[in-house]
């Protein structure tokens, strides 16, 4: 792609005139859409993840200079969280219109799916913890398993369910087996309807080393499941700077362990955060998020 200029790529890929053109991913698609030469077309760029460095941000472009020029051509840049927004603007010293709009999820469909039965979940009086996502290193699953071992050893009545598949699965299974955790950790694999499981758990847990604006945590709030998470991009926006709608700890195994343990030690606090999850989940309804995007696309800057 770098052999062609953005304008050449645009002529090759986009054959019609459009009133609005959207680059919904950073990098290559932004390079293509920025090549639009029709000044009557509104150009919009979406940024989903923190880039951290100019090298990473400009990796799909010929140079740092080209990356700056391409992003400067957009009439509106949209970031999925304040963390992503601040990171993007810092790297580019960006002064063009740039706003935060949260990802749209199908809240009505999620709530309907959440009502289905989930017989795989044990009804034995133990608190159910839930983690969701690809089984890979960046999701922090090994430290979450370590936390469950500590809780088991301290006789806390908990059971962790994990939804997802991925390259870390064999290592996780080996750790569970070697530490005798089969009775307190269940890997559910990939499920077409994760919501029926999340909605019936007492606490959603995120141990990730890095995230964008977590769709899984958003969906947990929508179905009314409290969230306890390490601090990654977007979580304080979602749950409050002072834990108004959920618990955000520093990004370490010990801090997450203490956060979960505190909720287990104080059932009234867990019940409080369930109410807050329901309240906060309404902010991410399809109606609200779609309206915000429509307003951005059809309105002014």
Q: Where are the predicted features?
A:
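Carbohydrate-associated surface elements
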Residues: 83, 104
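A conserved mid-protein helix/loop that constitutes part of the nucleotide-sugar donor-binding site
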Residues: 127-150, 167-173
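Short hydrophobic beta-strand element within catalytic cores of glycosyltransferases
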Residues: 226-229
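Membrane-proximal helix-turn-helix segments that form the acceptor-binding/catalytic region
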Residues: 7-16, 60-77
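Conserved acidic donor-binding segment of nucleotide-sugar-dependent glycosyltransferases
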Residues: 241-253, 262-267
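Aromatic "clamp/platform" in nucleotide-sugar-dependent glycosyltransferases that forms part
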Residues: 190, 209
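Nucleotide-activated donor-binding/catalytic signature segment of Leloir-type glycosyltransferases, i.e.
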Residues: 173-189
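An aromatic- and histidine-rich active-site surface loop
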Residues: 2-7, 20-40
């Amino acid at each position: 792609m770098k052999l062609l200029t953005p304008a050449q790529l645009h002529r090759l890929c986009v054959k019609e005139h459009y009133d609005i053109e959207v680059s919904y991913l950073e990098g290559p698609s932004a390079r293509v859409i920025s090549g639009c030469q029709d000044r009557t077309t509104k150009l919009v760029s979406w940024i989903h993840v923190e880039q951290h460095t100019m090298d990473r941000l400009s990796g799909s472009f010929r140079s740092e200079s080209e990356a700056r020029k391409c992003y400067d051509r957009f009439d509106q840049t949209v970031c999925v969280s304040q963390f992503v927004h601040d990171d993007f603007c810092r790297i580019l010293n960006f002064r063009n219109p740039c706003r935060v709009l949260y990802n749209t999820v199908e809240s009505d469909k999620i709530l309907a799916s959440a009502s289905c039965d989930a017989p795989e979940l044990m009804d034995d009086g133990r608190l159910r913890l839930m983690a969701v996502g690809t089984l890979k290193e960046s999701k922090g699953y090994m430290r979450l398993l370590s936390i469950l071992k500590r809780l088991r050893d301290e006789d806390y009545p908990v059971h962790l369910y994990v939804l997802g598949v991925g390259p870390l699965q064999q290592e996780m299974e080996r750790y569970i087996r070697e530490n005798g955790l089969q009775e307190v950790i269940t890997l559910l694999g990939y499920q077409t309807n994760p919501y029926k499981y999340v909605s019936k758990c007492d606490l959603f847990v995120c141990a990730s080393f890095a995230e964008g604006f977590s769709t899984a945590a958003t969906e947990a709030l929508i179905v009314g499941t409290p969230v306890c998470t390490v601090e990654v991009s977007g979580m304080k926006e979602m749950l409050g700077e002072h834990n108004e709608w959920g618990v955000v700890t520093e990004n370490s195994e010990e801090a997450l362990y203490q956060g979960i343990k505190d909720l287990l030690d104080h059932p009234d606090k867990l019940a409080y955060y369930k109410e807050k999850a329901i309240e906060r989940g309404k902010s991410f309804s399809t109606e609200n998020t779609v309206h915000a995007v429509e307003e951005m696309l059809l309105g002014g800057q």
